């Protein structure tokens, strides 16, 4: 009999959180909500908690807790309100919780995701930064504590589904036998055909207008710059123990083929589906079984054709910078992510031009390369380097 799962949805008010709660609500016999967390939207968090019957909510500070309590309109008892990053990690590791959806955007989601892995949970990983900034630490925690790691990014979920049946270890230490390459697909975002010379005047609204996916503002900008795909390359390296030279990116504007695995015998296995995050979320929640997701079926006759092309690195310099960071090592990946978060925040606030996002990242990577060699053996090491990289980026006069 399938075990009933009590899920902590970290970052519940974002698009991944919404989709996760939608899938959970479709399977009340198998799935329930233990905890929710949010950073700012307390009205929405209160409505979600009332609808799903969460036992716990986690908020960042006392002011947010007061806003949550003021917004509560549920007929049932108010959930326990926990405050601060430490309680977020404790909630992710709580014995009452079986499964953690790690969907907090950015490095802020790293400590709780790592705590879930250290507690041996089923971790549904939608937070790229856990692997980009702390890949070796995170994968070691999965292996050493018997955690179950299921990637939720559509690309990595697709690769996971296309891997050999015997290669589904939670944290492999070598590439799966017979696998030659991983092919990550990318839509190309809203500027796939735009002249690079015209990108200087791009506005936040234009960058956030993704042609296929509904996403938050930060990840929408990352998709436009293809830094998002670069982070996914780094993530794929850790998830599947695949060296960078065996990971390729293809532009696929229809977003129907979510990624592919090429085998030594010439076979290429692909996972296709509608561009709806409920599909990989349902896969992660139900694994190894399949759950209804609420996503409509794919009609290939409607598409008629599927296109693929190589990415233009002049238009997408952030993708090239990501491959360079992966080749340079984990400290460079920490710096890459930190610089991007600072630069994208500045762009969204109107303080930085779109084309300067890549320049900030490049400058921070050059700064990191000149630092004394550092070994990232603990979460504190990672967070210290992250803070120093953010400080350097913020003081460039560019952000």
Curated annotation (Swiss-Prot):
Disulfide cysteine pairs (residue numbers): none
GO molecular function: 1-deoxy-D-xylulose-5-phosphate reductoisomerase activity; manganese ion binding; NADPH binding
Residues that coordinate or bind Mn(2+): 153, 155, 232
Enzyme class: oxidoreductase
Entry binding sites for NADPH: 13-16, 127, 129, 216
Assigned keywords, A-Z: Isoprene biosynthesis, Manganese, Metal-binding, NADP, Oxidoreductase
Annotated 1-deoxy-D-xylulose 5-phosphate binding sites: 128, 154-155, 187, 210, 223, 228-229, 232
Catalytic activity line of the entry: 2-C-methyl-D-erythritol 4-phosphate + NADP(+) = 1-deoxy-D-xylulose 5-phosphate + NADPH + H(+)
Functional pathway: Isoprenoid biosynthesis; isopentenyl diphosphate biosynthesis via DXP pathway; isopentenyl diphosphate from 1-deoxy-D-xylulose 5-phosphate: step 1/6
Known cofactor(s): Mg(2+); Mn(2+)
Role according to the record: Catalyzes the NADPH-dependent rearrangement and reduction of 1-deoxy-D-xylulose-5-phosphate (DXP) to 2-C-methyl-D-erythritol 4-phosphate (MEP).
UniProt protein name: 1-deoxy-D-xylulose 5-phosphate reductoisomerase
Organism: Bordetella parapertussis (strain 12822 / ATCC BAA-587 / NCTC 13253)
Gene name tied to this protein: dxr
């Amino acid at each position: 009999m399938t075990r009933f799962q009590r899920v902590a949805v970290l970052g519940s008010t974002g698009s991944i959180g919404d989709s996760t709660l939608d899938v959970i609500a479709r399977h009340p016999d198998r799935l329930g909500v233990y905890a929710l967390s949010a950073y700012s939207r307390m009205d929405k968090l209160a409505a979600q908690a009332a609808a799903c019957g969460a036992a716990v909510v986690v908020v960042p500070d006392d002011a947010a807790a007061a806003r949550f309590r003021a917004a509560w309109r549920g007929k049932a008892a108010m959930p326990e309100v926990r405050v601060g990053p430490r309680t977020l990690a404790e909630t992710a590791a709580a014995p009452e919780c079986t499964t953690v959806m790690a969907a907090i955007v950015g490095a802020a989601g790293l400590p709780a995701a790592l705590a879930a892995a250290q507690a041996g949970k089923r971790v549904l990983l939608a937070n790229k930064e856990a692997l980009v900034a702390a890949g070796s630490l995170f994968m070691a925690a999965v292996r050493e504590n018997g955690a179950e790691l299921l990637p939720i990014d559509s690309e990595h979920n697709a690769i996971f589904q296309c891997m050999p049946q015997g290669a589904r270890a939670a944290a492999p230490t070598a590439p799966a036998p017979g696998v030659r390459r991983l092919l990550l697909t990318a839509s190309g975002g809203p500027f796939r055909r735009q002249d690079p010379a015209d990108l200087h005047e791009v506005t936040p609204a234009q960058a956030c207008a993704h042609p296929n996916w509904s996403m938050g503002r930060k990840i929408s900008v990352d998709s436009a710059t293809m830094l998002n795909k670069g982070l996914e390359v780094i993530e794929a390296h850790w998830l599947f123990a695949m060296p960078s030279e065996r990971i390729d990116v293809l532009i696929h504007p229809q977003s129907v083929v979510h990624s592919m695995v090429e085998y030594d015998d010439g076979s290429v296995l692909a996972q296709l589906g509608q561009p709806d995050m409920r599909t990989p979320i349902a896969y992660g929640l139900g694994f190894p079984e399949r759950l209804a997701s609420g996503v409509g079926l794919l009609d290939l006759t409607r598409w008629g054709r599927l296109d693929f092309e190589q990415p233009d690195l002049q238009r997408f310099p952030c993708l090239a910078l990501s491959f360079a960071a992966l080749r340079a090592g984990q400290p460079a990946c920490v710096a890459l992510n930190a610089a991007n978060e600072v630069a994208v925040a500045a762009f969204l606030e109107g303080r930085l031009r779109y084309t300067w996002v890549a320049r900030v990242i490049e400058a921070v990577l050059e700064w990191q390369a000149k630092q004394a060699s550092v070994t990232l053996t603990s979460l504190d090491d990672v967070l210290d380097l992250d803070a120093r990289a953010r400080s350097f980026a913020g003081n460039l006069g560019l952000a």
